[in-house]
Curated annotation (Swiss-Prot):
Positions of transmembrane segments: none
GO biological process, one term: isoleucine biosynthetic process
Pfam families linked: KARI_C (PF01450), KARI_N (PF07991)
Residues that bind Mg(2+) 1: D217, E221
Reactions catalysed: (2R)-2,3-dihydroxy-3-methylbutanoate + NADP(+) = (2S)-2-acetolactate + NADPH + H(+); (2R,3R)-2,3-dihydroxy-3-methylpentanoate + NADP(+) = (S)-2-ethyl-2-hydroxy-3-oxobutanoate + NADPH + H(+)
E.C. number: 1.1.1.86
Organism name: Citrobacter koseri (strain ATCC BAA-895 / CDC 4225-83 / SGSC4696)
Official protein name in the record: Ketol-acid reductoisomerase (NADP(+))
Keywords carried by this UniProt record: Amino-acid biosynthesis, Branched-chain amino acid biosynthesis, Magnesium, Metal-binding, NADP, Oxidoreductase, Repeat
Cofactor(s) demanded: Mg(2+)
Cofactor comment: Binds 2 magnesium ions per subunit.
Binding site for NADP(+): C45, G46, A47, Q48, R68, R76, S78, D108, K109, Q110, G158
Native organism taxonomy: Bacteria, Pseudomonadati, Pseudomonadota, Gammaproteobacteria, Enterobacterales
UniProt keyword annotation of tRNA-binding present: no
Keyword Metal-binding: yes
């Protein structure tokens, strides 16, 4: 199989990369009705599989889970989760032939095997659904021409998909129809009904393409969402300890600091995050972020280039074939870092203290978000897609670090995201070594003293922060998410 994106000519590539339309709420007036009375079979019962299924059932759809024979016979976790929640469970052979929509929610590396198994069993004219387009775009999976291929991609972990639905809300979602597989022209109707059944229409839906979703998703998770948080955690912890900070305090400042400062990001973008700082600290954070952007821009561009060309995917798939040797080695090495093994701090850190003593961390967030956004847009990805894959998901990933440090982040994210995270962080840490030697008192671990600032300089910095394209598109998109649940910040 050939990488689908690389089979397209330049005009087709640009058209698919740039496909992005914010859909009106009136387009979802029919809710999930298009799928009501039809049989939906989900393959895989992980975080996305279970939680999407729960939402879809609560929206009135007929949901069942198809699992491998051995998973059922051995009563594995997937079987237990599905049966404990009252779902019908059966083998591929028992359930797939009757399905009107088969939703493949297994991990990326299993997609080819799953599709190879279910496709011969699918009835003529059925639909195949994904929540990530890697198998179609990067692997180049060929699907029977009578089958409609659609995608509904919630921009949150599966647990959040469920929690927001239970609150009567939802999470922002991308939907798409594979242009090579829409024989009856019903792909968009299926995708809209599926998105409505998960609650995504209440938080905003982007009509996208498989290509745009994959390329932007890979870029976001490798750089700002996971790679920058991992590199920043390791660099900042080592710097604090080197400067004499108690390792336990340093660990807590970083572990919970990302979550606390990105909660402001979630509610009001980079503008609000920077407004939590004193004027002198804001000017310093801005200056640091500009330095970081200059240093890291080539690394961000390399990741985007390797994603566009398929170099990243081919390298990762080679590691799949080698029993994940690189991935598992990197995972083990990360678990042995000083940050991961530091003792816990039992004292309290106030919310504002995370901002006041985390100026460098704020600068890293600002630089990473803006660089990821800018690099995606420069590559032909529309601003709305770039926003969701950079700024929007960051607080959710930061929340995983607050639970159990980098270990938890790497457990929760997909293996694809984890592999890309290590590629980025292993390159970023040495890249920023020299920069870290120039850190001043007040940048990290100590607050910058209050003092006078130049009015004109402060005005210019405020205008630069608020005038960035991600702030403009973010203000519009956050307007659809006014009911977002607030992440509890640590003490």
């Amino acid at each position: 199989m050939a990488n689908y994106f690389n089979t397209l000519n330049l005009r087709q590539q640009l058209a698919q990369l740039g496909k992005c339309r914010f859909m009106g709420r009136d387009e979802f007036a029919d809710g999930a009705s298009y799928l009501q009375g039809k049989k939906v079979v989900i393959v895989g019962c992980g975080a996305q599989g279970l939680n999407q299924g729960l939402n879809m059932r609560d929206s009135g759809l007929d949901i069942a889970y198809a699992l491998r024979k051995e998973a059922i016979a051995e009563k594995r976790a997937s079987w237990r989760k599905a049966t404990e929640n009252g779902f019908k469970v059966g083998t591929y052979e028992e359930l797939i032939p009757q399905a009107d929509l088969v939703v493949n929610l297994t991990p990326d590396k299993q997609h080819s095997d799953v599709v190879r198994s279910v496709q011969p069993l699918m009835k003529d004219g059925a639909a195949l659904g994904y929540s990530h387009g890697f198998n179609i775009v990067e692997v180049g999976e060929q699907i029977r021409k009578d089958i409609t291929v659609v995608m509904v991609a919630p921009k949150c972990p599966g647990t959040e998909v469920r929690e927001e639905y239970k609150r009567g809300f939802g999470v922002p979602t991308l939907i798409a129809v594979h242009p090579e597989n829409d024989p009856k022209g019903e792909g968009m109707a299926i995708a809209k009904a599926w998105a409505a059944a998960t609650g995504g229409h209440r938080a905003g839906v982007l009509e996208s393409s498989f290509v745009a979703e994959v390329k932007s998703d890979l870029m976001g998770e490798q750089t700002i969402l996971c790679g920058m948080l991992q590199a920043g955690s390791l660099l900042c912890f080592d710097k604090l300890v080197e400067e004499g900070t108690d390792p336990a305090y340093a660990e807590k400042l970083i572990q919970y600091g990302w979550e606390t400062i990105t909660e402001a990001l979630k509610q009001g973008g980079i503008t609000l995050m920077m407004d939590r700082l004193s004027n002198p600290a804001k000017l310093r954070a801005y200056a640091l972020s500009e330095q970081l952007k200059t240093i890291m821009a080539p690394l961000f561009q390399k990741h985007m280039d390797d994603i566009i060309s398929g170099e990243f995917s081919s390298g990762m798939m080679a590691d799949w074939a080698n029993d994940d040797k690189k991935l598992l080695t990197w995972r083990e090495e990360t678990g042995k870092t000083a940050f991961e093994t530091a003792p816990q701090y039992e004292g309290k850190i106030g919310e504002q203290e995370y901002f006041d003593k985390g100026v460098l961390m704020i600068a890293m967030v600002k630089a990473g978000v803006e660089l990821a956004f800018e690099t995606m847009v420069d590559s032909g990805i529309i601003e709305e897609s770039a926003y969701y894959e950079s700024l929007h998901e960051l607080p959710l990933i930061a929340n995983t670090i607050a639970r159990k440090r980098l270990y938890e982040m790497n457990v929760v994210i997909s293996d694809t995201a984890e592999y890309g995270n290590y590629l980025f962080s292993y390159a970023c840490v040495p890249l920023l070594k020299a920069f870290m030697t120039e850190i001043q008192p007040g940048d990290l671990g100590k607050a910058i003293a209050e003092g006078a600032v130049d009015n004109a300089q402060l005005r210019d910095v405020n205008e630069a922060i608020r005038g960035h394209a991600i702030e403009k598109v973010g203000q519009k998109l956050r307007g659809y998410m006014t009911d977002m649940k607030r992440i509890a910040v640590a003490g």
